[in-house]
């Protein structure tokens, strides 16, 4: 959207904003304007930058040729303008390898000027291309009334948010391609109950609000925005 920078500047006058991006097309003039807008606002501007591997060999087969190098350039640019992007990666490796993979992410990010990286790991959603690559949801992978009886449904994004698009207002960003996720043409029309019956709802239930900004609780990442330390800072920034 050619008006996105202006939209974000306006948004910051009224509340916080988060940009979900692959980081490959960021421009200095955009970030300079957004930096100024955030500095003048009482609210924060977050960037969530999707990278699904710590190298071209691991990322590009998923996101496309050349995307890793362009994304890393985007990370460096964001850090240059004082933003601390949440690096978001879908776990396409064995869970037992988390520490090793996070350590490799950290090494690469530090090499691009991001000294205290914030990393958010997402579970694999068995929809879209992933359904063809591995498998779809199994018959038993659905939510039941019993599972929800003592569950705080505020942890589910659909309980308090909606997604506004040029095709209508949807219940959540994950189900945006599902016809039943379109709840109307306005926010008021969309404020109706939604039956959480999709397989993706099961994953969201398992892992909490996977679309929110909290970064990984792993010791290799930090959940609080901090200023990048200079090159002389200690190297063990694991908390």
Predicted regions and their residues:
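Canonical radical SAM enzyme core domain
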Residues: 1-39, 47, 51-58, 66-70, ...
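A generic structural signal for short, solvent-exposed coil/turn residues
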Residues: 11, 39-41, 79, 113, ...
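Short, well-ordered coil/turn segments that N-cap beta-strands
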Residues: 13-17, 41-45, 81-84, 115-117
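Short, surface-exposed linear patches
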Residues: 14, 40-43, 68-74, 108-110, ...
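Short C-terminal domain-edge/linker segments immediately following a structured domain
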Residues: 21-22, 50-53, 76-84, 117-121, ...
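Radical SAM enzyme [4Fe-4S]-AdoMet core and its adjacent flexible, acidic
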Residues: 50-52, 57-170, 180, 217
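Accessory C-terminal segments flanking Radical SAM cores
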Residues: 129-239
């Amino acid at each position: 959207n050619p008006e996105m920078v202006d939209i974000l500047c306006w948004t910051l006058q009224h509340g916080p904003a988060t940009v979900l991006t692959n980081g490959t097309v960021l421009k200095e003039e955009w970030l300079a304007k957004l930096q100024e807008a955030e500095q003048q606002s009482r609210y924060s501007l977050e960037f969530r930058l999707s990278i699904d591997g710590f190298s071209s060999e691991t990322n590009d087969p998923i996101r496309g040729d050349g995307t890793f190098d362009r994304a890393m350039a985007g990370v460096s640019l964001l850090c240059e303008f004082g933003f601390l992007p949440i690096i978001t990666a879908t776990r396409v490796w064995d869970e037992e390898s988390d520490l090793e993979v996070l350590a490799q992410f950290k090494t690469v990010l530090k090499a691009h000027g991001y000294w205290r990286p914030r990393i958010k790991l997402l579970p694999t959603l068995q929809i879209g291309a992933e359904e063809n690559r591995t498998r779809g949801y199994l018959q038993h992978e659905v939510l039941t009334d019993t599972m929800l009886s003592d569950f705080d449904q505020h942890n589910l994004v659909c309980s308090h948010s909606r997604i506004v698009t040029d095709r209508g207002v949807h219940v959540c960003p994950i189900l945006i391609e599902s016809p039943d996720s379109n709840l109307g043409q306005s926010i008021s029309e969309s404020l109706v109950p939604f039956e959480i019956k999709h397989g993706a709802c099961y994953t969201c239930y398992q892992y909490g609000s996977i679309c929110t900004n909290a970064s990984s609780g792993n010791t290799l990442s930090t959940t609080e925005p901090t200023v990048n330390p200079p090159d002389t800072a200690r190297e063990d920034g694991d908390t």
